[in-house]
Amino acid sequence: MALEKSLALLPLLVLVLLVLGWVQPSLGKESRAKKFQRQHMDSDGSLSSNPTYCNNMMRRRNMTQGWCKPVNTFVHEPLVDVQDVCFQENVTCKNGQANCYKSSSSMHITDCRLTSGSRYPNCAYQTSQKERHIIVACEGNPYVPVHFDASVEDST
């Protein structure tokens, strides 16, 4: 009798273990869209000419853990405006993929470049503010930016 009940619960136990095995790896893992936002969005960031902006932001956004990320760009526009770029001019990505899009208008950005001679753990960045078109790679449902590909000057 007890054996029959145990055997009846076996398929349920197997199902629970399969679901846990499928769900568990994705728990706590940052999505590509969230990583893009962490690494590139600073909608509330001031456009002051603070020379330590990049040093502070790169550290705060976890891009100097274990190494110094050599180049990064922060976009100072509302997230929805950056997400809208995914429905603007389609361009080829630097890696040859076809899922990149160029913003139809210039956006306020800050470029951060690792200064020569800078070594981990003392990552030091040069901060330069610009107004440029951005190019982002998009994917997913909803279709959102997942990679910052480039920034380009106005071609007029």
Swiss-Prot record:
Disulfide bonds: 54-112, 68-123, 86-138, 93-100
Glycosylation sites: 62, 90
Binding site residues for substrate: 35, 38, 69-73, 94, 113
EC number: 4.6.1.18
Reactions it catalyzes: an [RNA] containing cytidine + H2O = an [RNA]-3'-cytidine-3'-phosphate + a 5'-hydroxy-ribonucleotide-3'-[RNA]; an [RNA] containing uridine + H2O = an [RNA]-3'-uridine-3'-phosphate + a 5'-hydroxy-ribonucleotide-3'-[RNA]
Enzyme class: lyase
GO CC annotation terms, alphabetical: extracellular region
Protein name: Ribonuclease pancreatic
Lineage, highest ranks first: Eukaryota, Metazoa, Chordata, Craniata, Vertebrata
